[in-house]
């Protein structure tokens, strides 16, 4: 059964998609509430732990989330969405419980690590699900626009809602987070298991399962999986630094943006909140329209526009202090990410081989996530050594480099070398990363 939404040219919302959307929203609420609002204050003011312990705990969450995405993607291919997400959410429930009732930094650090590992399957599951549901329908960009709305919405709602309850009792706040995860767990039970398309049953039957041959054969199965990926995933080598730079540019600004607004621009917390809401609203309003246009006309123009706009806007924040200019730049940054968010993953989806899509998604997400791990570390050093503008200049430079890389790898007429599975799928013609029904396989 599928639901039609007025204004959508194609059927996008399915029960599976809606479940993934709600799970994404709830998990982002929990993560943003914990990492932004609760842990820094709870660990410092209530438990009396050091700033170093707080920083390490937050880093452990990012590391667990990032480096377990590839295994999670591999697991989705073999046991399906339901079991993968259920395992991750059960682990997340246990992690939040450890954080809530653990009073030592070691226990809280363990909880943060488990939370990262538990939420790692989320993006591979979502992207794999969208890839499967939109295959042949040319509406991946539209679907990504809707999913990104849940991500941004959950990230914004979490800290705001939790702030309403945090003054009464931290215990009550933790129960709210556990309740959100419990609802997500119930929704995960509605996800499909291993779904095999008719045309791919033979290929899937040949694919090694998690338990095929017992644990002693697991290493051989993994080796076979990565051999298949190496033979069939033939993309431009420049795609890998592009994946890193896309998140590195954001990671550079994440730890210092609040400090910059308060100490350099001298704005109040209320005005800072208004700026964030304004930029976020511009992004959210543009996600679905840009996603639909990318489905129709391809991703190249929209990504180039987004990267150029982000480069100029972030550079402007480093150079200008006038409030009128700051407002314009914030709106432009919001618009740039409305161009980038739904179209970036759409472009990546066109690079996937026929088999092992979940594993490849996890691999790409791990590379991309490294930028969010490295960026904050470098950002602080840049601030201390070269001043407040330095992180913005490096972030703008990263966006500029990303624009140049994308101009090169997406240029018209570019020929790529593909593995046997892709050559068979395209009749021997190289695959161009421009999507949309009007784009052709070159």
Q: What do the predicted segments below correspond to?
A:
Residues 12-62, 235-238, 242, 247-265:
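Helix-loop boundary and gating motifs at the non-cytosolic
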Residues 83-97, 301-316:
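Structural signature of the two symmetry-related core transmembrane helices
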Residues 2-14, 195-240, 423-438:
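Juxtamembrane intracellular "pre-TM" segments in multi-pass secondary transporters
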Residues 67-80, 166, 287-298, 383-384:
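Helix-to-loop junctions at the C-terminal end of transmembrane segments
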Residues 62-70, 155-156, 280-288, 372-373:
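Residue-level signature of mid-helix packing/kink "hotspots" within the transmembrane helices
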Residues 173-190, 392-407:
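Symmetry-related core transmembrane helices of the 12-TM Major Facilitator Superfamily/SLC fold
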Residues 95, 106-114, 324-332:
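Paired small-residue
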Residues 113-151, 347:
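Cytoplasmic helix-loop-helix junction between adjacent transmembrane helices
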